[in-house]
Amino acid sequence: MLDAKYLRNDINIAAQKLEKRGYTLDVAQFTALEEKRKSLQMRTQELQNERNVRSKSIGKAKASGQDIEPLLAQVGQLGDELNAAKAELTGLLDEIQTLTLNIPNLPDDSVPEGKDEDENVEVSRWGTPREFDFEVKDHVDLGAGVANGLDFETATKLTGSRFVVMRGQIARLNRAIAQFMLDLHTEQHGYQEMYVPYLVNEESMLGTGQFPKFVGDAFHTKPATEEGQGLSLIPTSEVPLTNIARDCIFAANELPIKMTAHTPCFRSEAGSYGRDTRGLIRQHQFDKVEMVQLVEADKSFEALDELTGNAEKVLQLLELPYRKMLLCTGDMGFGACKTFDLEVWLPAQDTYREISSCSNMLDFQARRMQARYRDPQTNKTELLHTLNGSGLAVGRTLVAILENYQQADGSITIPEVLQPYMNGVTVIGAVK
């Protein structure tokens, strides 16, 4: 959520920046609501003051023997007017909050202006795509060939489309990938491993910016009672990890806080009908190792470079070719002010596909969550800056390994860094 004071004082500048990312801020509507808010707040304060004055005069009138009935009637009428004004103000503040909760973050000045992914800027490349002397298979055929290790047909029977059943060596490889990532981030990159709930409440989804804008993209449980609140399956462990800081005040010497977790993620993919219908690329349920950092306000861009580098290290150790992209204004996520995507090479598609997205949210999420730290110089509380990134998406990493490490006979060579997690197995092969 953007700073309300900033919007009041620099609404036109905010509108110009938001326009760059394809969001049109209704300046007239916001200005009108703010004018009405100020008027109502003044009216409420005036009524409160007048009521206090009249209430005090009742005691004096009573002490002097005057008839206090007229004063009591006046105080009662003022009380009714005050309650009505407060109710109207509360409704107006809710309307303003609903508006501001749906406004995306402002793009940083270093972000290139553009409409969509076609205008993202390539920053760098690592590795050289392998040249094959045989016909390349995609991960669906390769996975099926390893003892039916990727079984989409059974998953469709169990649940529906965009799910998978993994078995045998493919399931073990999938687990090995996640374990390797967690070990790397905790042992070399300084993150604390966390185990978090896969179901979260509305406040958590609101805190990280999934709600209210993307409420239709989540899977929800029904409340246990009419009064109870339904829960949502996490679309990413960014939600529970970041919300750990909600309503907290940290000492500066506790920062940065770096957390990582391996969880399933659940997304309805409401806006992707017909896209990536084959295979693991776009699933309703998928595993991801997430990285989250909570830092001081002046450290977040430095932290973004570090966090992105942590994700890159995974790809480098797996020896998977990738490119680093700086997202343009029109392709960034709702809460991000700057984002780097890492795209891994997929031979069967003959292109790079996103495998990690690393974003600096500035204080956008922290303001929603009231996640703060105490500045040691001023002793005042300041909003944290939050960052998150995939380190990596496990399923897409499995896809990349299957396709990049495939052999002519359909077998898969296991990347060297994963072999200890596979009990020394170096090759998994197709059943003949």
Curated annotation (Swiss-Prot):
GO terms for molecular function: ATP binding; serine-tRNA ligase activity. This is Serine--tRNA ligase. It is found in: Cytoplasm. Its EC number is 6.1.1.11. Homodimer. The tRNA molecule binds across the dimer. InterPro entries: aa-tRNA-synt_IIb, aa-tRNA-synth_II, aa-tRNA-synth_II/BPL/LPL, Ser-tRNA-ligase_type_1, Ser-tRNA-synth_1_N, SerRS_1_N_sf, SerRS_core, tRNA-bd_arm. It catalyses: tRNA(Ser) + L-serine + ATP = L-seryl-tRNA(Ser) + AMP + diphosphate + H(+); tRNA(Sec) + L-serine + ATP = L-seryl-tRNA(Sec) + AMP + diphosphate + H(+). Catalyzes the attachment of serine to tRNA(Ser). Is also able to aminoacylate tRNA(Sec) with serine, to form the misacylated tRNA L-seryl-tRNA(Sec), which will be further converted into selenocysteinyl-tRNA(Sec). The gene is serS. It is an enzyme of class 6 (ligase). ATP binds at R267, S268, E269, E354, I355, S356, S357. It comes from the Bacteria. Pathway: Aminoacyl-tRNA biosynthesis; selenocysteinyl-tRNA(Sec) biosynthesis; L-seryl-tRNA(Sec) from L-serine and tRNA(Sec): step 1/1. It comes from Pseudoalteromonas atlantica (strain T6c / ATCC BAA-1087).
